[in-house]
Amino acid sequence: MSKKRIIILGGGFAGINTAMQLERRLRRRSDIEITLISQENYLVFQPMLPEVISGNIGILDTVTPLRRLAPKTQIFIREVSAVDVANQTVSLAPAFEKAETHLKYDHLVVALGNVTDFRQIPGLHDHAFPFKNLQHALRLRDHLIRVLSEASITQDATLRQQLLTFVVGGGGFSGVEVCAELNDFVRDCAGRYFNLNPDEVRVILVHAGDRILNHEMPESLGIYAQKLLQKRGVEFIFNMLIKTATPDFAVLGDGQRIQTKTLVSSVPSSPNPLVLNIDVPLERGRIKSQLSMQVEGTNNIWALGDCALIPNPHGEGFCPPTAQFAIREAKTCATNILAVIDDRPLTDFAFTELGKMASLGHRRAIIRMFDKINLHGFIAWVIWRMAYWVKLPGFDRKIKVGISWFTDILCGRELVQTGMDLPAAVTESHFEPGEMVLEQGEPSARVSILREGKAEILKTRPDATPEVIGQLEAGDCLGIDEFLDDTSANYSIRCLEKMNIVSYQRKELAPLLTLPEIRQGMEKLRWPKEK
């Protein structure tokens, strides 16, 4: 008799906890096998991720290997390319193999979560730091150390202020916690750099609501958090959205431009694109599940976590996309999958939210418990730490985090970069009208192609007034002359219409110049064309 296969898509809280719950229930059974597919081989404990920025905990303390959590589960570290519901098949993108891998399932669990989606806001994908996983946290930390270092040595006052201005978009849990840790980190570290004063630092939080945590916490706790962060130097801009981002600005909905080299966006998120391509009922981009976690209209497909729309067991709306709900949903899902296999009745999900917590940095936090009790300050911070410490998966992780917290008190912060913020070989940039793309005399480290938009080319006359000497349109190259001649720009470029450019590092293209045919082709791209 062949084994029944349960395939779980996603290794977040919902996915890995479903696998763990199934393993516990299948200890004495050998007729069922569990397969989990994830793009990472670890679970990120996201509630503590902001502490990676400040260095309060070690780099790897927020992650736990999936195989340690679910040792009896077959794990594929692959990208899912397709799900064929009719043939009960999951297709995995190739890795070292040249062909796709196809896996048959008897039961499918969809726990893919959501993804950061910057597509609706021009420039955000190119110039904002998302904050969803460990890589994002490490990249942001490296960047913060780099801009502080550059600010301490630059002689350009405008650039210095730009480097020391930090903008965070979003006033929900993620945005507030990131803002609090970032503010603590940069102000504390600024005092350690020669020629930097912490008072020069600006940290600005932009939020669409009229106060932070306006949907997440009672008004009294939200106001407490707001006043506390203001006291620490954080500035707030309310009832405003970030409209677009460029290499030098965060542009707000009212047209205001904030000069900055650091924009962190905790919003927006959207359904995982794969979910939209699975042949199951959807609403608001999420899979419609019942209280049993069974997808409507199916008997062997289950959905839970952020990607699922599950009715609230108390009859008010839907279950929130939080870790505490995902963990309990996983328990119900595992129970009901085995109930279907064993021909037993299903169990409905029942859970009452225990509470909500937010860390505000510097040993302060806010807590809403059992929808009745409000706590704030140092006591709330102690409870916040203990609650999440207990929830950390794995005893070894608890030990490591405890040691990190203790050594942080004794030794302070480590300003060490991990190399996660290295410039990419190919980048995309967005510019707004009137913005300078290139300044005359500026050394250009990149060769760029104007993908869309329009720019004008300026040259400074002997009397120091600029003269327009030409225009660039979609398809034209920027910096090709300087690349071929190994010189700095003898002209400036200013954006006329909203433009997007694709840029390539000169050092990556340099080896191509040794090929005569390639160099001849590049010569034809010089500006002006008759040169």
What are these regions (language model features)?
Residues 1-82, 166, 176-216:
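Beta1-alpha1 glycine-rich phosphate/pyrophosphate-binding loop at the start
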Residues 159-217, 223-227, 235-237, 319-359:
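Rossmann-like dinucleotide-binding core of oxidoreductases
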Residues 362, 469-528:
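Cyclic-nucleotide recognition modules
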Residues 33, 75-90, 183-291, 295-297, ...:
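A Rossmann-like FAD-binding core segment of flavoenzymes
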Residues 2-3, 74-165:
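FAD-binding core/adjacent interface of flavoenzyme oxidoreductases
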Residues 325, 335-420, 521:
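C-terminal, flexible cofactor-proximal segment of oxidoreductases
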Residues 127-156, 249, 257-326:
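FAD-site-proximal beta/loop scaffold in flavoenzymes
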Residues 302, 415-482, 489-491, 527-528:
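Regulatory nucleotide-sensing modules
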